[in-house]
Amino acid sequence: MGIAVGGKGFGRTAGEPTRYLRAMSTDGLLTSPLHERHVALGAKMADFGGWLMPIEYPGGGVIAEHTAVRERVGMFDVSHLGKARVSGPGAAAYVNACLTNDLGRIQPGKAQYTLCCNESGGVVDDLIAYLRSDDDVFLIPNAANTATVVDLLQASAPVGISVENLHTAYGVIAVQGTLSDEVLGSLGLPVGHEYMSFVEAEWEGLPVIVCRTGYTGERGYELVPMWENAGPLWDTLAVAITERGGMPCGLGARDTLRTEMGYPLHGNDLSLDITPVMAGSAWAVGWDKPAFWGKEALTEQRAAKTSRLMRGLLVAGRGIPRSHCVVKDASGAEVGEVTSGTFSPTLKQGIALAQLERSVAMGDTVTIDVRGRGLEAQVVKPPFVDVQTK
């Protein structure tokens, strides 16, 4: 199946109104199109970016869900993620002049990790850009930052460029793990396309975008159905996944999986104060492009080589580091701060991502202050486990 550049999956049929179908829960948080299914399963729900989302399900919780993805397959509702479309003559060139990465490096049908920065180099959001054509780019920002990203792109858009907030026009279901191809294949969906590419397909006569992307470090896919079609697709996937020893997974497992890979989380490891240079995301910056938001500030910071940098921390004994814990060197001097920390179900020990001074070298032993208790840790380069995405 080829890539459809002008089809019905991303975007709307002419004259069709934008959908605003998201529901409000009783406590004012937004809910996904799969909310009632999570409640029926007994999921533990919590606020995530202003959305009431499943953190874990009964029957094992985070560790079992994490292990299912690493060893077999799991499925996540990530419909809280934003969706936006930039279209019109030269839309890709416009996006390329705003966001950090270089869309010129990829062809239509491919996706690219990129960042939206402010003029001081701070990260407004990190997102995935799906290049449909020179005149059509689909974006997946983070839930809490979607409106801000859309507003910024709308404010600078030249005449003829349309920027649409389609947050609730689509659901997103991630199927991740070594058996993900088998699961999708059993539904008649396309599999086997290159990592960071996407195919426009149909399931039961309904449009769905099959993206070879994910946030777990495992081989997998992210499916983008229309909002109202997410439920039936989820139900069918659940049967196929359960038959193969997998399970629905909450955002708790998604967080431990991404931390093991060293993938940054906006608000923790990337922020208005933590730039791409500091976060180890300079690879997602098109330094040779003539312009992008924050280029001057980031170029200066990159050349100065004085900022803190993201490093991994592997805890030697028992204990779990958490965000904002202070990191000290052997002399007791403060040399950094944890930005993300968790227990690694794969390694069965504490791990963390931290912003550390450049004087701290790989292999050094440091101490993490966790509520007055010192945890010894080794400085390492993420990922903490092998990458299996391809």
Named regions from a protein language model:
Residues 1-23:
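N-terminal amphipathic/basic-hydrophobic helices that include classical n-h-c signal peptides
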Residues 20-49, 53-57, 65, 130-390:
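Conserved, structured C-terminal
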Residues 18-114, 122:
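Acidic, proline/glycine-enriched N-terminal capping motif
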Residues 89-123, 178-206:
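Internal amphipathic helical hairpin motif
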